[in-house]
Amino acid sequence: MYGKCVSILPARNLFDEIPQRNVVVWNAMISLYTHSNRVPDALKLFQVMDIAPNVSTYNSIIAGLAELDDGSFKAIALYWKMREMGLIPNVITLLALLPACIGVAALNLIKEIQSYAIRNDIDSHPQLSSGLVEAYGRCGCLVNAHTVFWGMKERDVVAWSSIISAYALHGKARTALEMFQQMELAKVQPDGITFLGVLKACSHAGLADKAIDYFARMRTDYGVEASSDHYSCLVDALSRAGRLYEAYQVIREMPVKVTAKAWGALLGACRTYGELELAEIAGKALSEIEPDNPANYVLLARIYASQGRHEEAERMRSEMKEKGVKAAPGSSWIVYQD
């Protein structure tokens, strides 16, 4: 009812005019707030409910909190409050809770979610299984991710992408690429997220040529258009392999907006390989994209210092002071003069 309203205001006005609101009405308004990224408003409404909330109420709030940068612990706390109230979680509850678990690496709770799902015979739910694969993978529990994945009766693109990304993220790049090959053999159509995992695997394994090949196949074989994240991964793969000018060429020819990720990958590799000219280009670009990020200034200063260009290194420090940019706690310039 409320979800079909063009604006939240008419829905809220209608909500306020209803003299006796049942839980369905409360849930509809709370859900509209959370789906509109107005979680604080949803929480305020939740706190003034004059009737007992039900599972759907908690599901909306937990899902909304889990999407906030600082909301994971709050979402988990609300889940336990829901359990204390005697309410029985359903699949939607567990799906809402998993992102919060990932946000704070709550591995024990992820295991509890899986156990609960098995006890209540909902562990075969494909979306929940894929979510568990991702959650275990993101937390570095690859054995559990592997077990859940191969225990699925049917594996969709989300499940395949999750297991590929899990291996790529935790240093199992070649396993990630082998999983992609199995995905192709299973005739599952990969998407953009799948290829992000594949490209990251290539990057971490130093397989720049394979990264170029997979990047090309995205569009030619599967019709997946490359996003800025895909280009950044390709730049990272080339940069890590020491092919800095090829990486720079990719940046120059990108048909999408160049992000700080791409320039940052190039700048980091410039320090590794002692490439000053490209470092200056990347540093200048980053100062325009992220003028308040101290890491970029510090990294470029270190590159200058490593090349014996101490005046330029000091200039970077002065530039930071002029712009009011403060170095992150614990970071050091480490600029030595001979």
What are these language model-derived features?
Residues 1-338:
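Terminal (and in a subset, N-terminal) low-complexity or junction segments at the ends
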